[in-house]
């Protein structure tokens, strides 16, 4: 790293064979901050980072000058997070692994604020396109108090209004409202339904209708989740209806409210695969898979289904 930028200072081409391949050309070289295998993405492989490079990437991925090298680091870090080799608490400085991989206690104490502060800063940036991406991602994050305040501004904004460089449209208002509902930021189900009805009255488009379906499925009550679940697995919804219903049902990973479906999923999975189109069966089963259940019983049910 020099002058705040991470640039390549040396490159060696080598064919990797076996479990260990020596690189004689680098003997005697000063150790680099970042050693990147498969730089330039010359071959298809799963690549990893050594311990020092991993720690460096956590702090400096945004400083890597080459877009290709930066992308490879993102990919390697994500694979290591999924494999349990990189703690998810290091990953929120990059994407939103907080939901499914981070220690919940750390998320509550530190991770949520860390992630939301970064996303809000991005949403307040000067580039409108980038600001929109950050704002959309914020709606998928575990919400801090600052995030709630920001999303409330988006919901209250008139269509076409600007919040910083961000132009607020109906789709963004729906995303913000759904996030607030899913995180119990409305007093009760009736208050959430009133907010949905108000926004639906202002947005009578086909997109608005589907967004209302998603928002209702996100209401954090056992009854609302049951209604959404039954609709999603009924084979009576359109493809768009299924997609929006399952998105709302699982928004914000409401594990406790979804425990009621742990066994039912495995009972109805064969029927869904038989009755739905292949694409929608795959989407529905993937979205509804009880990833919130991490018990041995869950693993047993999954093994039995696949047997």
Where are these regions (language model features)?
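Long, ordered, helix-rich scaffold segments
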Residues: 2-7, 24-307
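Short proline/glycine- and polar residue-rich coil/turn motifs
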Residues: 13-20
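Short beta-strand segments
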Residues: 8-12
């Amino acid at each position: 790293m020099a002058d705040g930028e991470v640039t390549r200072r040396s490159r060696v081409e080598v064919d990797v064979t076996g479990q260990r391949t020596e690189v004689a050309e680098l003997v005697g070289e000063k150790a680099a901050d970042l050693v990147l295998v498969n730089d330039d993405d010359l071959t298809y492989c799963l690549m990893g980072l050594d311990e020092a490079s991993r720690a460096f990437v956590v702090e400096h991925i945004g400083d890597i000058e080459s877009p290709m090298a930066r992308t490879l680091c993102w990919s390697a870090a994500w694979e290591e997070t999924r494999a349990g080799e990189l703690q998810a608490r290091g990953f929120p400085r990059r994407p939103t692994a907080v939901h499914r991989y981070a220690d919940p206690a750390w998320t509550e104490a530190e991770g949520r604020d860390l992630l939301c502060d970064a996303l809000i800063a991005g949403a307040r940036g000067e580039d409108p396109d980038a600001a929109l991406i950050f704002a959309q991602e914020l709606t998928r994050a575990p919400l801090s108090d600052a995030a709630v305040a920001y999303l409330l501004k988006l919901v209250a904004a008139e269509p076409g209004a600007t919040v910083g460089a961000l132009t607020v449209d109906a789709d963004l208002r729906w995303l913000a409202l759904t996030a607030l509902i899913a995180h119990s930021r409305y007093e009760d189900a009736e208050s959430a339904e009133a907010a949905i009805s108000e926004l639906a009255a202002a947005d009578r488009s086909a997109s608005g209708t589907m967004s209302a379906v998603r928002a209702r499925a996100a209401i954090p009550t056992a009854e609302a989740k049951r209604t959404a679940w039954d609709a999603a697995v009924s084979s009576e919804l359109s493809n768009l209806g299924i997609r929006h219903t399952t998105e709302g049902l699982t928004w914000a990973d409401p594990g406790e409210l979804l425990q009621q479906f742990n066994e039912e999923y495995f009972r109805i999975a064969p029927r869904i695969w038989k009755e739905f189109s292949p694409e929608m069966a795959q989407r529905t089963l993937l979205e509804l898979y009880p990833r919130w259940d991490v018990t041995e019983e869950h693993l047993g049910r999954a093994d039995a289904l696949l047997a």
